[in-house]
């Protein structure tokens, strides 16, 4: 029996195993330290109308014009992919980006006229590489899960986010997802995200956007970090929304 067992083991295909000593260490690169890392997936969430999309647009604008993000160093301008399924490109997205000062030649989007985009679509990685994109925004999450995907089922959500995370890692692109919170009251915002808790578990950073209700005269919003798997959490950052966009 022992000989037979050895013979079977010899015929089996070896399992690919690596030694940790063979892994070359790398340093995390940041688009906005410590909020948004390059090569990873970040989630921006909050209740409807609190400024999630405005914040995402402002970040996209800063990336295209090289201006300084709050508490961050100036960056060299680069191309951005902005995918949205909730607002009109011509009447909403472009005017808002303009208010934020975006360089429109650097803001791109994948044309979905013939085929709707999903997280597993191979056009994502191709578009990132072909356009030298370093930031991709998808707004909102549920619009890009794909047909017949139940976002409340962990076994259906995990492969999608694993695939998206792999794209981010291979290309070095920061992928930012916009998510709404559900209507549950009294529960932690981490667990009020739409869908499976695996969504929050799969991303490396979670930013939460909220409106400061006490500030009646000024439209003040605050973004703070709920999760950071890569660095120490930063203090909340306040911004305002007005006729000139985000400040």
Please annotate each region the language model reported.
Residues 55, 59:
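Hydrophobic positions on the alpha1 helix immediately C-terminal to the Walker A/P-loop
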């Amino acid at each position: 029996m022992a000989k037979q067992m050895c013979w079977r083991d010899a015929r089996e295909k070896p399992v690919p195993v690596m030694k940790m000593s063979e892994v070359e260490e790398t340093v995390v690169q940041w688009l906005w330290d410590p909020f948004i890392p390059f090569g990873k997936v970040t989630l921006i969430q909050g209740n409807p109308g609190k400024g999630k999309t405005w914040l995402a647009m402002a970040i996209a604008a800063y990336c295209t014009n090289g201006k300084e993000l709050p508490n961050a160093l100036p960056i060299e301008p680069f191309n951005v992919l902005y995918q949205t399924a909730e607002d009109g490109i011509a009447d909403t997205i472009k005017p808002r980006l303009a208010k934020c000062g975006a360089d429109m030649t650097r803001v791109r989007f994948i044309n979905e006229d013939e085929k709707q985009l999903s997280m597993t679509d191979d056009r994502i990685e191709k578009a990132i590489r072909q356009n030298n994109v370093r930031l991709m925004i998808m707004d909102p999450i549920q619009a890009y899960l794909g047909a017949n995907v139940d976002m409340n089922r962990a076994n259906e959500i995990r492969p999608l986010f694993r695939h998206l995370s792999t794209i981010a890692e291979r290309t070095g692109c920061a992928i930012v997802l916009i998510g709404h919170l559900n209507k549950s009251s009294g529960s932690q915002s981490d667990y009020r995200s739409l869908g499976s808790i695996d969504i929050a578990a799969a991303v490396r950073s979670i930013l939460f956007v909220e409106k400061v209700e006490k500030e009646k005269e000024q439209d003040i919003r605050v973004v703070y970090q709920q999760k950071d798997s890569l660095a120490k959490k930063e203090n909340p950052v306040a911004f305002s929304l007005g006729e000139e966009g985000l400040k």
